[in-house]
A protein has these predicted regions:
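Charge-rich, low-complexity N-terminal segments
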Residues: 2-174
Length: 174
């Protein structure tokens, strides 16, 4: 089976799979203590893919200079436990919970974890990300993440025209 066939097969299996639990989505913002390097991105992504597959968690981490936004999805207990661990992580500070909610669908269907730095991203993506980040940071309490914001985050994950490889193992953690 070719790489493309394997990728499409994994995508199809994931799409067909019905979750046997409500999807819990948590979004948070933070600031890194020091700038992330490419090696940091690679390390976070490789460790997160393995750990998130074991928990049946999917995620997207976006970093733009001193701004971090992450979306995590999965079982509520698994996502909340992961968030507690993230809050204690000394690589970042000013951790703010933006949104924590149940949903009927998983938005980050095939990605155990995608890490995206915005170096080299088109100007409009940088500006839109910074505007959304500032808006969410300034909001009192929790906010509802809009479909437009989710679409922006997915566009960032796909920027450069290269979709992230599916990394979620179907049935993992179940």
């Amino acid at each position: 089976m070719s790489d493309e066939s394997s990728r499409l097969s994994l995508l199809w299996e994931t799409i067909q799979r019905q979750e046997d639990y409500p999807i819990f989505r948590l979004t948070y913002l933070s600031r890194p203590v020091k700038p992330f390097t490419r090696a940091d991105f690679d390390d976070i992504e490789s460790k997160s893919v393995e750990a998130n597959n074991a928990r049946d968690v999917t995620g997207l981490l976006i970093v733009n200079n001193d701004r971090i936004l992450q979306i995590l999805e999965g079982r509520e207990d698994a996502v909340r436990a992961l968030y507690t661990k993230i809050e204690a992580d000394r690589r970042h500070t000013v951790v703010k919970l933006v949104s924590a909610m149940e949903d009927e669908v998983r938005l980050l269907l095939t990605w155990s974890m995608v890490v995206r730095g915005l170096d080299g991203a088109p100007k409009h993506l940088l500006e839109q990300f910074d505007d959304v980040y500032d808006e969410l940071l300034a909001a009192e309490g929790e906010s509802e993440i809009s479909i437009d914001q989710i679409d922006l985050f997915k566009e960032i994950a796909l920027f450069g025209g290269i979709p992230p490889e599916p990394t979620r193992k179907v049935g993992a953690g179940s």
